[in-house]
Amino acid sequence: MEPMLLLILVAAVVLLFVRWAFVYGHRTSNMPKGPPTLPFIGNIHQIPTQYTHIKFTEWAAKYGGLYMLKVGNGNMAVVTDRRLVKEVVDRKSGIYSHRPHSFVSHELITKGNHLLVMHYGDQWRTFRRLIHQHLMESMVDSQHVKIVNAEAIQLVRDYLVDPEHHMAHPKRFSNSITNSIVFGIRTADRNGSNMKRLYKLMEEWSEIMETGATPPVDLFPWMKMLPQWMFSNYVNRAKAIGVQMETLYTDILNKVIKRRNGGQNLGTFMDRVLDGQEKNDLPWHQLAFIGGVLMEGGSDTSSSLTIAIVQALILNPAVQKKAHAEIDAVVGSDRSPVWEDLEKLPYINMIIKEGHRWRPILPLCFPHALGEDDWVDGKLLPKGTVVVINTWGMHMDPSQPDDPAAFIPERYANHPQLAPEYAAGKWENRDHYGYGVGRRICPGIHLAERNMFLAIAKLLWAFEFQRGEGKIDSDPVTGYHNGFLYCAKDYPCRPVVRNKTIRATIEREFATATKEVFSQFTEG
């Protein structure tokens, strides 16, 4: 080959490589703006591995309510604008309801059977339809509220007799409600075996899904070929979590089937699903996962929010004082609050909404993925773009009248309704984004609203929450764990029962709940 021709070929290859380097990892001019990128990696080096919502909120202040990050050659759109959430993600939910593919989560752990990460399609629709039928508002009010009320009085009693383990009691409360409704198997105390297995599983899954815990194989598929020992044996660890997950779900399903074979059909969620198997024809692994997914979703969300609200109450005694006055005027000491008291206890509803806003359980909604190209405010979001809803950024919007960092329930004085009303309404009046957005909004929203009202109303009726020994760190970074869910680290708490009559009422109502409600269920 002639030297000149060889030189031309080499120059052409170099030019193509340079051009590719500047295209790969860079956004195009018709996309939303965002932080400066580097060739090949885009913005990967700038995305923190922990408390990502803090950085995303900083970028929103600089680049606006919709900006684009380049993750390798992939696209990530971050939405921190209430209008866009409604007009784009909600109203175009048919193309915004997909999930980004995850090799670790989809292929190694769940095999695509977990509703949280399940791709948008027929299986997802079947799961959502079955869940909706059992957790629609009318069903919750007619069948499930009595269980929630009973478990809430045990929650109060647990704080009374075992204040040392106050961080565990909300977990037992929410887990027992969910397991009773889904399987007919309640969690009688904080040492329940099913609950311990579940929280161990969720902790390990959360750890392996944290940014940086595994190689970025979804961005650079060639990294799957590298020996896994280079990355803490992530494949084996993920598969072990998957086995742990499937084993737990299957064990509990088998208990339901054994009970049914003995002639006991309790009308639980899984009883209804099994009754409809001739029509639904779910494979065995999907039967196990549909119940297990509900157990997961209902166990850690309400509990984490309850823990955050109790922390806020300790730090804001004036809020407690106002709540006590409202409850005393409506309820008194001879009974605890019930669901029917909701309209007469508006300040309790404000406290719960403020808890959702102040410390959202998911500061960043679980990522959506775009099913086709979309143009938003004149900017292109290509098909496959990962769409992140920055709940934290919207909740901490500095333009709101009151200090967003402060716990001020009164900011919701004009929001007397429950969250589903505002989620379906105008974006200007949305109360909070604690339950998600679009078609991926929490399917248990009606149950969760009742869980939270009865838990917080009864706890405030029963106790004055005082500081225990030691420091309370409510800082959104240093005071909170940041895994799958955003949860307060352990803090000291001293629940002081408000009077002798309330103490006697707690014991009386707990005895009634044990006899009339808890006796229906087995323990696990």
From Swiss-Prot:
Cellular compartments annotated: Endoplasmic reticulum membrane
Chain ranges on the Lumenal side, renumbered to this chain: 24-524
CDD domains the record matches: CYP64-like
Domain of life where this protein originates: Eukaryota
One Pfam family linked to the record: p450
Cytoplasmic side: 1-4
The keyword Lyase is assigned to this record: no
GO biological process, one term: patulin biosynthetic process
Use in biotechnology or industry: Patulin was originally used as an antibiotic and specifically trialed to be used against the common cold, but it is no longer used for that purpose since it has been shown to induce immunological, neurological and gastrointestinal effects. Genotoxic effects of patulin with dose-dependent increase in DNA strand breaks in brain, liver and kidneys have been detected in mice. However, more recently, it has been proposed that patulin might also have anti-tumor properties.
Keyword Repeat found: no
Binding-site residues, heme: C442
Residues that carry a glycan: N191, N499
Originating species: Aspergillus clavatus (strain ATCC 1007 / CBS 513.65 / DSM 816 / NCTC 3887 / NRRL 1 / QM 1276 / 107)
Catalysis performed (reactions): 3-methylphenol + reduced [NADPH--hemoprotein reductase] + O2 = 3-hydroxybenzyl alcohol + oxidized [NADPH--hemoprotein reductase] + H2O + H(+)
Pathway: Mycotoxin biosynthesis; patulin biosynthesis
Record protein name field: Cytochrome P450 monooxygenase patH
GO molecular function, a single term: monooxygenase activity
Organism phylogeny: Eukaryota, Fungi, Dikarya, Ascomycota, Pezizomycotina
Cofactor(s) for this UniProt protein: heme
GO CC list: endoplasmic reticulum; endoplasmic reticulum membrane
Keywords: Endoplasmic reticulum, Glycoprotein, Heme, Iron, Membrane, Metal-binding, Monooxygenase, Oxidoreductase, Transmembrane, Transmembrane helix
EC number: 1.-.-.-
Family: Belongs to the cytochrome P450 family.
